[in-house]
Amino acid sequence: MNKIISFASDFGLSDGSVGVVKGVINRIDSDINIIDISHGIPPQNIKYGSLLLMRAIQYIPQGVLLAVVDPGVGSERKPIAIKTDWGVMIGPDNGLLNLACATVGGAQQAFALENENWIIPHEGCLLYTSPSPRDLAV
């Protein structure tokens, strides 16, 4: 069985954030195939990201959808996992996954991801501390 994670974010490609996520996935299981849906979602634009995922979910292989578009990244908001007939969707609990989930028939179960063993610490982590060019633009 193919192990596939389809990945979308608003990270952009100008820093190492996408590479860090893909590297962590690869360290956990080097046999996982990662499909990049988009990393050019406008920063923190949940509506845009949600519409993009709704359209994409119809064409990408079943498996895992990992999506990150979150104005509160690094906050106390917990990431969630949603089990569907299509597979599992992982992302912030901010509505980003709602349209994609509805498109594939709705949620069977949803869980807050709270196991600290699977969460990258914020201190010194590129995903939380490295400014991107869009953050530095005047």
Please state what every model-predicted region is.
Residues 13, 73, 135:
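Short, glycine/acidic-enriched loop or turn micro-motifs at the edges of active sites
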Residues 128, 133-138:
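Single conserved hydrophobic/aromatic residue that forms the stacking wall/gate
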Residues 3-4, 28, 33-34, 40-49, ...:
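Active-site histidine-anchored catalytic micro-motif
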Residues 15-35:
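N-terminal glycine-rich anion-binding loops that anchor highly charged ligand groups
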Residues 6-16:
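N-terminal beta1-alpha1 ligand-phosphate binding loop
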